[in-house]
Amino acid sequence: MLKVGILSDTHCTLIPQLFNFFKDVDELWHAGDIGNIETADALANFKPLRAVHGNIDDHVVRMQYPEDLFFHVEDVNVYMTHIGGYPGHYMPEVKYILEEKKPDLYICGHSHILKVIYDKKLNLLHINPGAAGNSGFHKQITFIRMVIDGKTFKDTEIFQLDRNSRSF
């Protein structure tokens, strides 16, 4: 059993509530637009970090974190990238990868819109955790934690905070 925290689009901002929400997870998975290497290091010093770079990340972050990441945890094959779309609206190159690699879990960011959708056609769970940072057009700061037990995804919880609340 593995407890994971899933986030994206921090854009150099780590709100204090993030650390409390993720305090009991085993790993953090960041789907890009980290912002800078200091943000990545802060996350990696807090919990083991798996991450991909995003379109706003500089060369230092890009040298440390790949564009695409494939890995296996429990009995689940995971594919993570920053820009990729969602069921019925995948980017062509991502759709090709999903059809060829057949991951059980596909994670992306970029849109700043939280989505958790099961794709019946490709038999995978798609997660976009939304935006964990405060830069962008989104109205809510969001991120996710869940448990992976064998091939089962369970105990999924969403953190959501109105950006205008200024309680961070």
Describe the predicted segments one by one.
Residues 1-5, 70-79, 119-125, 148-157:
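Beta-strand-turn-beta hairpins that frame and shape the catalytic cleft
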Residues 1-49, 57-70, 75, 139-142, ...:
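N-terminal active-site segment of His-dependent metallophosphoesterases
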Residues 6-8, 27-33, 50-55, 79-82, ...:
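Active-site neighborhood of phospho(di)ester-bond hydrolases with catalytic His/Asp-centered motifs
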Residues 11, 87, 133, 150, ...:
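Residue-level detector of flexible, active-site-proximal loop/helix-junction positions
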Residues 12, 36, 85, 113, ...:
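Short active-site segment of divalent metal-dependent hydrolases/proteases
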Residues 50, 89-152:
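Conserved beta-sheet core of the metallophosphoesterase superfamily
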Residues 50-100:
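Helix-adjacent hinge/juxtasegments
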Residues 156-168:
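Short, solvent-exposed aromatic-acidic interface loops
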